[in-house]
From Swiss-Prot:
Component of the exocyst complex involved in the docking of exocytic vesicles with fusion sites on the plasma membrane. Disulfide bonds: none annotated. This is Exocyst complex component 3. It is found in: Cytoplasm; Cytoplasm, Perinuclear region; Cell projection, Growth cone; Cell projection, Neuron projection. Keywords: Acetylation, Cell projection, Coiled coil, Cytoplasm, Exocytosis, Golgi apparatus, Protein transport, Transport. GO terms for biological process: exocyst localization; exocytosis; protein transport. Its main location: cytoplasm. Residues 34-62, 618-649 form a coiled coil. One of its GO terms (molecular function) is SNARE binding. InterPro entries: EXOC3/Sec6, EXOC3/Sec6_C.
Length: 755
């Protein structure tokens, strides 16, 4: 009653909901007055929709009813079938109970049947019993002739007679050992024939990969014999469950022995491939591994294409042979890994084990697909053994790289003392063979490591970069010693400048080679992490190049020293050509420096420009002369301006192509000349202030020396200028490059300034 009430309530709610929805739809249709004309049209349309929905609903309900009707019919049929089966089982049970007594009453008949079968077996074997010696001779002859199938047939007859007699004797009187021994002794030659036949079978199986190509019929005969023996073994084991009797020599398990023979053959074949030793041939391991690769591939291809046709499918001969070869190879690789291998031998072994073995050259060969799945093969060497080999290799490689780098540097050092200039690259830049030798060595080791694994390749690259760091430190020391040796005797080495240029250029080559090496052998993400963990070699290389450039400039300024000392002297005032000689000397040296690669040549040109100007200003501050008149000051200042322009022209020429302004340093000479040239002493403070604002690193002793050079500043004027400048020190701009700070004014000049 409650269910009916709930159902009625639900239907009522549904009706109300439908009415509300209909009202809402009608209200939506009749929102404007002109839509009243279409009321009939709307009514017909809704009627059609209603009829369509009702038709679909009826069809769905009818389909559900048909399904229910079919299900009920099938359940009814199943119930009838269950009743029939139940009745049949009851009938069978009744018949079985009625037959128990009948079976027990036939016991005497059963005993008679057993006795009859024993007598029948004796009669059947009488002929064989009397012909045993003759059959033994025939079987022996057939074995010697290689007629294995016929020999086995004879052997089976002998064994069948012996086993039949012994079985019947066992069933009649299992405790009678004398009769059993008598039968066994009479057939004593049978076991010997079986062993002799087995030897012949094993000999054929040992040469199965050769036999299958020359005489596959013989191999098939061997397999048939083994299969016959397996069937006899199974039959005897089944009979043992009933009688408890097992004939002597059974089970033979020739199938199991066959696989053992094949396993020993595979092991012997793998071990016998080593023809050389390290003493007789340095490439012994490579040859050994290549022979193994060729033999194993050839054997497995033959096994896949020919051998499987000679064996029953359930022998799964190819899969078993593959497992044997894999196991034999694993043992052989472990034996090799345990030897005291050299670095190149470790590489050969690991490359073969980790790559060659699963490659298309061996197990991944198309001729072995799809039977061989390289992804399913177990590793030939355990991860621990591989790790130990890699550790040994890395240790040996570290020692080798250190020795190679040391030898390369020693060879390069010998070249530095040659009387001939170093070689030039395709662009005409001097270079030595050191970078090429070093990175060729790195490249070779990285290529070898890449054959083994990505991880080893990365480790070797890290090792190379680490050793490169140490090597560059030694390279820097040797370059410094080379410079010091030259300074002790500037006539030696003869090509010092050219080889120092080559050393500088080598730094750029090293940089480029390191970048190339990383790009070639590192993935981007690995390179980023390596750069964070490894110190940058750019700093070391730049330091070597900078010291090299400084050494060359030192060479230049040693030749310029005499002429720089002539500046701002009486000789200079009288028309010395010191600046001309300076320009010619610098340009001549820079003709050799043209063989320096651009990044370093650019820095060197800028440094030479700066140092020439500094030395010129140093001469100004040395108070080598003191102008006595305005005319002398004007003449000296104009000469300074001309020489500044001369230097400007020179360094513009040397810096052409660098894209930088080379005028800034020479402007300093012009600015100092303007202070000297000034004719009105009252404006001297203003001019000096302007100079100090441009060059904030100028000190009071510089100003004092400059005023002393003018020769017309009174003591009070000097004091006033100095005190005023000290009250408001100038702040240097961030981009200002100091030029006065390294110019030291002799203390004598400062003392005279205050007099």
């Amino acid at each position: 009653m409650c269910k009916d009430s709930a159902c009625f309530s639900t239907m009522k709610e549904t009706d109300l909901e439908a009415v509300a929805t209909a009202v809402q739809r009608v209200a939506g249709m009749l929102q404007r007055p002109d839509q009243l004309d279409k009321v009939e049209q709307y009514r017909r349309r809704e009627a059609r929709k209603k009829a369509s929905v009702e038709a679909r609903l009826k069809a769905a309900i009818q389909s559900q009813l048909d399904g229910v009707r079919t299900g009920l019919s099938q359940l009814h049929n199943a119930l009838n079938d269950v009743k029939d089966i139940q009745q049949s089982l009851a009938d069978v049970s009744k018949d079985w109970r009625q037959s128990i007594n009948t079976i027990e009453s036939l016991k005497d008949v059963k005993d008679a049947v057993v006795q009859h079968s024993q007598l029948a077996a004796a009669v059947e074997n009488l002929k064989n019993i009397f012909s045993v010696p003759e059959i033994v001779r025939e079987t022996q002859d057939l074995i010697e002739q290689g007629a294995l199938l016929q020999a086995h047939r004879k052997l089976m007859d002998l064994e069948c007679s012996r086993d039949g007699l012994m079985c019947e004797q066992y069933r009649m009187d299992s405790g009678n050992k004398r009769d059993m021994t008598l039968i066994h002794g009479y057939f004593g030659s049978t076991q010997g024939l079986s062993d002799e036949l087995a030897k012949q079978l094993w000999m054929v199986l040992q040469r199965s990969l050769v036999t299958v190509r020359r005489d596959p019929t013989l191999l098939v005969s061997v397999v048939r014999i083994i299969e016959r023996e397996e069937k006899i073994d199974r039959r005897i084991l089944d009979r043992k469950k009933q009688t408890g009797f097992v004939p002597p020599g059974r089970p033979k398990n020739w199938k199991e022995k066959m696989f053992a023979v094949l396993d020993r053959t595979v092991t012997t074949r793998i071990e016998g491939t080593q023809a050389d030793t390290r003493e007789s041939d340095k490439m012994w391991l490579v040859r050994h591994l290549e022979i193994i690769r060729k033999y194993v591939l050839d054997d497995l291809v033959i096994a896949k294409n020919l051998l499987v046709q000679c064996f029953p499918p359930h022998y799964d001969i190819f899969k078993n042979l593959l497992s044997m070869y894999h196991q034999a190879l694993s043992i052989r690789m472990q034996d090799l890994a345990s030897e005291d291998l050299e670095a190149n031998e470790i590489v050969s072994l690991l490359t073969w084990v980790l790559n060659t073995y699963t490659s298309a050259e061996m197990m991944g060969n198309v001729e072995l697909a799809p039977e061989v799945d390289v992804n399913a093969l177990e590793p030939l060497l355990s991860p621990n053994v591989v790790s130990e080999l890699l550790d040994t290799y890395m240790s040996t490689l570290t020692s080798n790289i250190i020795a190679w780098l040391r030898k390369a540097l020693e060879t390069d050092k010998k070249d530095w003392s040659k009387e001939t200039e170093p070689e030039a690259d395709q662009d005409g830049y001097y270079q030595t063979t050191l970078p090429a030798i070093v990175f060729q060595m790195f490249e070779q080791n990285l290529q070898v490591a890449a054959q083994i694994s990505e991880d080893l390749k990365t480790k070797v690259l890290v090792l190379c970069l680490q050793q490169m760091n140490s090597f560059l430190s030694r390279y820097k020391e040797e370059a410094q010693l080379y410079k010091e040796e030259h300074l002790r005797n500037r006539q030696h080495p003869h090509c010092y400048v050219q080889y120092m240029v080559a050393i500088i250029n080598n730094c750029q080559t090293f940089k480029e080679s390191i970048i190339s090496l990383k790009r070639k052998y590192l993935k981007p993400e690995t390179e980023e992490s390596l750069c964070q963990s490894q110190p940058s070699m750019d700093g070391i290389l730049d330091a070597i190049a900078k010291e090299g450039c400084s050494s060359l400039l030192e060479e230049v300024f040693l030749d310029l020293e005499q002429h720089l000392n002539e500046l701002m002297t009486k000789k200079w005032m009288l028309g010395s050509n010191a600046v001309d000689i300076i320009c010619v000397t610098v340009e001549d040296y820079f003709n050799d420096f043209a063989k320096i690669k651009k990044p370093y040549k650019k820095r060197m040109t800028a440094e030479a420009h700066r140092r020439v100007v500094v030395e010129y200003l140093r001469a100004v501050m040395q108070k080598r002369i003191s102008f006595r008149s305005a005319e002398e000051r004007k003449e000296g200042a104009e000469k300074m301006v001309r020489e500044a322009e001369q230097l400007r022209f020179l360094f513009r020429k040397l810096a052409s192509g660098f894209g930088e302004d080379a005028d800034g340093h020479c402007d300093t000479i012009v600015a100092v000349a303007e202070v000297i040239k000034l004719t009105d002493p009252s404006l001297l403070y203003l001019e000096v202030s302007t100079l100090v604002s441009k060059y904030p690193d100028i000190r009071d002793d510089h100003i004092g020396a400059l005023l002393a050079l003018r020769g017309d500043a009174s003591r009070d004027m000097k004091q006033t200028i100095m005190e005023t400048l000290e009250q408001g020190p100038m702040q240097a701009s961030p981009n200002y490059v100091p030029i006065f700070q390294e110019i030291v004014v002799p203390s004598l000049n400062v003392a005279k300034l205050l007099k």
